[in-house]
């Protein structure tokens, strides 16, 4: 297998095991195009992977993720791994998990839902993880992966 040649980061976050083609969506939902700390963002797409066949990897220099951001990643890449890097070493590594209840991260796809008209925090219950399916607490609309990704 070919060696992956990407420079190491001193401080920051590496998001690994993103399904091939979804790395750009991870960058979009984390708003990494608007970084103001001067840190580099690296996207490796369609990289060979024993586990997935092909995968994407996102490296973010000088930035660590909040719990809400990790939950957003779980909706796009439920099997992703997050690596926290300090002084060029992995100091923490964990798999993302889709929470049972998703609050304030996702918009409801139902234009008539109260959350689209009032200042109400959205709330969804996970019905299924594989394939991903959620139900709105307020209007009970069920959304599947494609609609979930469109409403992040």
Curated annotation (Swiss-Prot):
GO terms for cellular component: aspartate carbamoyltransferase complex. One of its GO terms (molecular function) is metal ion binding. Its cofactor is Zn(2+). Zn(2+) binds at residues 108, 113, 136, 139. Binds 1 zinc ion per subunit. InterPro entries: Asp_carbamoyltransf_reg_N, Asp_carbamoylTrfase_reg, Asp_carbamoyltrfase_reg_C, Asp_carbatrfase_reg_C_sf, Asp_carbatrfase_reg_N_sf. It comes from the Archaea. Keywords: Metal-binding, Pyrimidine biosynthesis, Zinc. The keyword Zinc applies. One of its GO terms (biological process) is 'de novo' pyrimidine nucleobase biosynthetic process. Contains catalytic and regulatory chains. Involved in allosteric regulation of aspartate carbamoyltransferase. Belongs to the PyrI family. This is Aspartate carbamoyltransferase regulatory chain. The lineage of its organism: Archaea, Methanobacteriati, Methanobacteriota, Thermococci, Thermococcales. The gene is pyrI.
């Amino acid at each position: 297998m070919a060696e992956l040649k990407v420079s190491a980061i001193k401080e920051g976050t590496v998001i690994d095991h993103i399904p091939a083609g979804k790395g750009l969506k991870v960058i979009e939902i984390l708003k990494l195009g608007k970084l103001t700390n001067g840190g580099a963002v690296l996207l490796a797409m369609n990289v060979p992977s024993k586990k997935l066949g092909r995968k994407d990897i996102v490296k973010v220099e000088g930035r660590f993720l909040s719990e809400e951001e990790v939950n957003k990643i779980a909706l796009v890449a439920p099997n992703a791994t997050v690596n926290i890097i300090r002084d060029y070493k992995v100091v923490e590594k964990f798999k993302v998990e889709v929470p049972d209840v998703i609050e304030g991260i996702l918009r409801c796809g139902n234009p008539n839902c109260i959350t689209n008209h009032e200042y109400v925090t959205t709330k969804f219950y996970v019905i299924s993880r594989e394939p991903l399916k959620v139900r709105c607490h307020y209007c009970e609309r069920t959304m599947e992966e494609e609609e979930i990704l469109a409403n992040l």
